[in-house]
């Protein structure tokens, strides 16, 4: 084999390995965490967050979430090898060794903590580590294989990114930060359970007691509906009593929440209809993205609108 051929082969192997490492981190899951983090930062900073702090916090959040997801893949590699949708992942497929996953996770966690501690503050760095600990210790290790409430309690890990973002900007956690935490916490079950309904056969095969497996479709649909009912008033707490966003955001939150409730109600009418569960799962993602966009838009646009109206009023005097 010529030198160029060996070089080409090595480059190809490295490229494949990097792709496997990225797959370990579940990048599609991370995007939504970053959106909620950025929204929390803009609300906390009232639309005046420095681009440097925003980029560092989002980069650190990416590393922290990637570390947690990598450890999750490592721990679950036995059941991933059995489940149809996960058996081709790098660890169960044998493309990545367990020690590589451990090394990658530790490196990512250290990077996340170091960046936040150095360029934001210690509180945000510790919160990021707490997110990893809750996801790995509470959800993955303790609850996922033992309780149908696994995603409810363990879902607290997914609600920590807004706390990290808020703390990075302010150095503290106000009531508004905890409302953001509560919003993600309440949103997680009606987001995840429709997906669990779609793949419940896989969960049953590996004896993971997700609610659709243990309680059935009807009970799951009813629980989803109850959580969506609780989500709308929770999202409005940012308007009152917290007062960190205006009723411009509130109108969007009511509209999105009403449609979410309607979609969830539709599922209760036909719990076994998989297409309704699929549509609800997809809408839950869109709901959170648009809600965060409404927060950011409210904080970025409202001050300029107020200034413009004041200037217009001065001209008309």
UniProtKB/Swiss-Prot annotation:
One of its GO terms (biological process) is heme O biosynthetic process. It comes from Thermosynechococcus vestitus (strain NIES-2133 / IAM M-273 / BP-1). The keyword Transcription does not apply. Keywords: Cell inner membrane, Cell membrane, Heme biosynthesis, Membrane, Transferase, Transmembrane, Transmembrane helix. It is found in: Cell inner membrane. Pfam families: UbiA. It is a multi-pass membrane protein. It catalyses: heme b + (2E,6E)-farnesyl diphosphate + H2O = Fe(II)-heme o + diphosphate. Belongs to the UbiA prenyltransferase family. Protoheme IX farnesyltransferase subfamily. The chain crosses the membrane at residues 29-49, 53-73, 102-122, 123-143, 151-171, 179-199, 224-241, 245-267, 283-303. GO terms for molecular function: protoheme IX farnesyltransferase activity. This is Protoheme IX farnesyltransferase. Converts heme B (protoheme IX) to heme O by substitution of the vinyl group on carbon 2 of heme B porphyrin ring with a hydroxyethyl farnesyl side group. GO terms for cellular component: plasma membrane. The keyword GTP-binding does not apply. Carbon 2 of the heme B porphyrin ring is defined according to the Fischer nomenclature. Disulfide bonds: none annotated. Pathway: Porphyrin-containing compound metabolism; heme O biosynthesis; heme O from protoheme: step 1/1. It comes from the Bacteria. InterPro entries: Protohaem_IX_farnesylTrfase, UbiA_prenyltransferase, UbiA_prenylTrfase_CS, UbiA_sf. Its EC number is 2.5.1.141. The gene is ctaB.
């Amino acid at each position: 084999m010529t030198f160029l051929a060996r070089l080409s082969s090595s480059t190809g192997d490295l490229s494949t390995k990097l792709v496997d490492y990225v797959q370990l981190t579940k990048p599609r899951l991370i995007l939504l965490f970053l959106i909620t983090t950025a929204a929390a930062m803009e609300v906390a900073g009232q639309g005046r967050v420095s681009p440097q702090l925003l980029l560092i916090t989002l980069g650190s959040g990416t590393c922290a979430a990637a570390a947690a997801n990598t450890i999750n893949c490592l721990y679950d590699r036995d059941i991933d090898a059995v489940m149809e949708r996960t058996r081709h992942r790098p660890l169960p497929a044998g493309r990545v060794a367990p020690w590589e996953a451990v090394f990658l996770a530790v490196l990512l966690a250290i990077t996340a903590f170091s960046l936040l501690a150095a360029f934001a503050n210690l509180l945000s760095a510790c919160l990021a580590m707490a997110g990893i600990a809750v996801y790995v210790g509470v959800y993955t290790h303790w609850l996922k294989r033992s309780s149908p409430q696994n995603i409810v309690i363990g879902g607290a890990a997914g609600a920590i990114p807004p706390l990290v973002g808020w703390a990075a900007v302010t150095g503290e956690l106000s009531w508004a930060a905890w409302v953001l935490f509560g919003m993600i916490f309440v949103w997680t079950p009606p987001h995840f359970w429709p997906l669990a309904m779609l793949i419940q056969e896989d969960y049953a095969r590996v004896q993971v007691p997700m609610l659709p497996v243990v309680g059935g479709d009807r009970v799951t649909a009813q629980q989803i509906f109850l959580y969506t009912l609780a989500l709308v008033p929770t999202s409005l707490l940012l308007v009152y009593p917290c007062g960190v966003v205006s009723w411009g955001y509130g109108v969007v939150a009511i509209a999105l929440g009403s449609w979410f409730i309607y979609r969830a109600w539709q599922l209760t009418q036909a719990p076994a209809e998989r297409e309704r569960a699929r549509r609800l799962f997809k809408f839950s993602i869109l709901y959170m993205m648009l809600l965060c966009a409404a927060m950011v838009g409210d904080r970025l646009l409202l001050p300029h609108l107020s200034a413009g109206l004041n200037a217009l009023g001065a001209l008309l005097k």
